[in-house]
Amino acid sequence: MLINNRIYNIDTNSRHWAISLALIVILSVIMTFIPFVGLCLSLMFFRQRFAPILFIIFSFYFGWFYEPQMDLLVHYEHFHRIADKSLVEQWMDSGTSKYGKEIYPVLFKYFIGLIADNRNFFSACACVVYTSLFIFGVVKPLQPLYMQKMSIPAWLLFLGVIFTVEYYWFLGFRFWSGAFVFTGFYLRSLNSGAVKYLWLSALCICFHYSLLALCVAAVLNLLLRYRFKVYYLILIVSFIVRFAKIAFVTNIAQFGIFENYVKESVRNQNIIQSVGKYAEEIREYGNQFYLLRETIAVFGVLAVIYILYKKIGKEFWEQNVKFWGFCILLLSFANFGYVSLTFYDRFFKLAVLFLYVFTYMWVMDIQSKLSFKSQLLITMVTII
């Protein structure tokens, strides 16, 4: 079991739910006039029961004032055009096939259309869904750990987990919300061993078709079990595919079974070539710090894992090899999709997130065994 399910409850208000509820109502009224208060309070009292609720309320205001941009703007424009149609008519609309025919975007647009056709409201609701699923997928599974006293290395890794996820990802609309659905159920599956969570993690496909890759990785991880030579062989092959610039993902997307499911931009050769040229230009002339920061983060977290392995031993690693194996598969899948800038960027960030979660759990498990020298070394590596 990855996490001890016993939560160290230091929240005195949790004994009196009525008091907590009244506090939430009062703070919500205050946030109506000063939304930033909710963010500050949710961060200051992140261990308290009301913190996630305040954070979600703040996300509504954040999305409202941020307004749709990038992918979210495209979906809003499509929503604006079909808002007065029935659910069936929206499903059959040509734009639905073009921008995503998964269950989540279709139902989201339909139910928002029943309330209001307003771009600020559309963005606010998208941000609320994204934030709620982030809490479900990342924050809640780690709650039994961050409720405990944490050492400096644990704090830094916990912050690494939280800040790996960036605020503007809600503009992706479909992908990251679905990714957090998978993360939430899969972490629960690893922790409890319950097969039902593994099945439920497949719900991520209802958000974005590319998340099928996560389901494939989960099943492959289940089948491979402890055959780590195969894991590392897959990783080596993925690097060969990456540096040879083989369009592995787009070639798979050409299969007939994806014809009515994936977006046209993934199957149209002219669009694929244009996107490929754009990706090369971005990687060559784009902001190198932004492009390399996840790579630097991976090397940092792998260095911490190496230190833990050498200084403390491999007991935690042996108990949680399934988690480690999934991290290896995620890195491999990201490499397989390197030619596609969007696919690689998304799945590499997911791999970074899972590696940080794995390392944070490891440090929390053995922090009492860490010497001052080891803590200092991990702290320096994590900061760098």
Placement of each model-derived feature along the sequence:
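Membrane-interfacial loop-to-transmembrane alpha-helix junctions, especially the N-terminal start
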Residues: Q48-I53, Y231, E315-C327, S371-T379
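Alpha-helical transmembrane segments and terminal signal-anchor/GPI-anchor hydrophobic tails
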Residues: P68, L73-Y76, I82-A83, V88, ...
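Short hydrophobic/aromatic helix or loop-helix immediately within or flanking a transmembrane segment
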Residues: L73-H80, M92-D117
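Transmembrane-helix motifs of polytopic, lipid-linked glycan transferases
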Residues: C125-L145
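Transmembrane-helix signature of polytopic, membrane-embedded enzymes
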Residues: V138-V161
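Membrane-interface alpha helices of multi-pass inner-membrane proteins
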Residues: V165, K196-L220
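Membrane-water interface signatures at transmembrane helix termini and the short loops
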Residues: E166-F182, F207, V304-I366
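Membrane-interface transmembrane helices that cradle and orient dolichyl/undecaprenyl
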Residues: A179-K196
